[in-house]
């Protein structure tokens, strides 16, 4: 029997009609034959034949219809962020909480391949079922985000740095959504490098519009921009994984050899970095802070 795409990708009540080995046989509302592996039950209780239970319905790669009681965060009626597992020539493969990965086709990803997501990034998606009942991930459109974001109508977030993920990347700017639901636009003039689709980035809030959408920047505040000595120290910290065995009590000779600056210049530079929470100064070492790491995107 052909799969009924009305139930694929959704949560439905199905009747248990039998048990074969470790597989329950279920019947859909239109007579669809659906299988349930016991590993996809949410507890150890046996299901009773003749009773109806709630399941999420999905096709496997061969087109067979399967059910699970482990409800995914994403359905064909619900958008959420899904983790990218890997990318290949077909697109990005994501984890939506099912026993199988789901493909976001390459045609839906940015034309510039360097802006494709990488493993560990998160895409804002829903599930899409095509005419052959294959299941794919569909990226959220601008109209979808407009109906789900949390508007902001005051300046309480101005100059705050928050984490967000791009759901749309264009030459004119980056469109991002935070976990709190804030919708943020970063104009191309407020960035030096374009973030990947789905990449977790730190963005500084610089204002909002009448619709409650936030404007952001990937650039530091003018007074936080580094002088030459500060940039030398910052670049070396990045090169050495965010930690250097130097501090304000290091010898002038060692500082001169590594940084090519006097101890006085070094102390002024790390003092500036510390004041703006770019580094931590600890006994015998300096380390990059989370805010410090967030500057990498803006300096590339």
From Swiss-Prot:
It holds the Pfam family CvfB_1st. The keyword Transmembrane helix does not apply. It comes from the Bacteria. Signal peptide: none annotated. Keywords: Virulence. PANTHER family: CONSERVED VIRULENCE FACTOR B. Contributes to the expression of virulence factors and to pathogenicity. Involved in the production of hemolysin, DNase, protease and protein A. Belongs to the CvfB family. This is Conserved virulence factor B. It comes from Staphylococcus aureus (strain MRSA252).
